């Protein structure tokens, strides 16, 4: 129990209900209202990350870095990419070398430190992302042309209605 309390004290800024500097006065609270709203909206995700980080005894930022790529895979309409082949390795690093193709050496080292502890979690999220992408891709392929036609019709009606074919 003491370890969890120490962990929460160490990462109180990320794992707290409110940002650390907004509980001093009403003026601070009102000045930081947009940040507070973002904090409250992201509370379920932060709760999951902090609980997992506490159980695995790793930095919550490490968990967040490792969750973002699989979460992006799980939302194909945001990334507009097909999911890559899953592996149990960190997706961005060459194992053991700490070299990442798209990141500077400091971030590359951080990924490599996170890799061993969270590779199973990456695998699970990646597999879930592939399943979601497989389900959503045909639906999106059907919906996208309809949205394009609707937007085209609205633009046409607003610019020159006499040539829209009505």
UniProtKB/Swiss-Prot annotation:
- The reply on keyword Nucleus is no
Segments crossing the lipid bilayer: 35-55, 60-80, 124-144
**Cellular compartment(s):** Host membrane
Respond yes or no to whether keyword Transmembrane is given for this record. Answer: yes
Coarse class of the protein's main subcellular location: host cell
Signal peptide as annotated in the record? none
Keywords of the record, alphabetical order, are: Host membrane, Membrane, Transmembrane, Transmembrane helix
Cellular component terms, GO, for this chain's entry?
A: host cell membrane; membrane
Regarding the membrane, this protein is recorded as: Multi-pass membrane protein
State what protein this is by name.
Answer: Putative transmembrane protein ORF166
Organism the protein comes from: Acidianus bottle-shaped virus (isolate Italy/Pozzuoli) (ABV)
């Amino acid at each position: 129990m003491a370890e969890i309390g120490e962990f929460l004290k160490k990462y109180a800024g990320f794992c707290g209900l409110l940002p650390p500097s907004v509980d001093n006065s009403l003026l601070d609270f009102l000045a930081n209202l947009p940040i507070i709203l973002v904090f409250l909206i992201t509370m379920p995700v932060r709760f999951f990350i902090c609980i997992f980080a506490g159980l695995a005894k790793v930095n919550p930022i490490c968990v967040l870095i490792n969750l973002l790529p699989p979460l992006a895979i799980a939302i194909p309409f945001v990334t507009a990419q097909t999911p890559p082949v899953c592996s149990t390795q960190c997706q961005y690093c060459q194992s053991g070398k700490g070299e990442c193709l798209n990141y500077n050496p400091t971030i590359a080292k951080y990924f490599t430190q996170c890799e061993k502890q969270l590779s199973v979690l990456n695998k699970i999220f990646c597999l879930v992302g592939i399943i979601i992408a497989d389900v959503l891709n045909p639906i999106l392929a059907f919906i996208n042309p309809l949205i394009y036609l609707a937007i085209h019709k609205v633009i046409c009606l607003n610019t020159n209605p006499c040539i829209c074919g009505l």
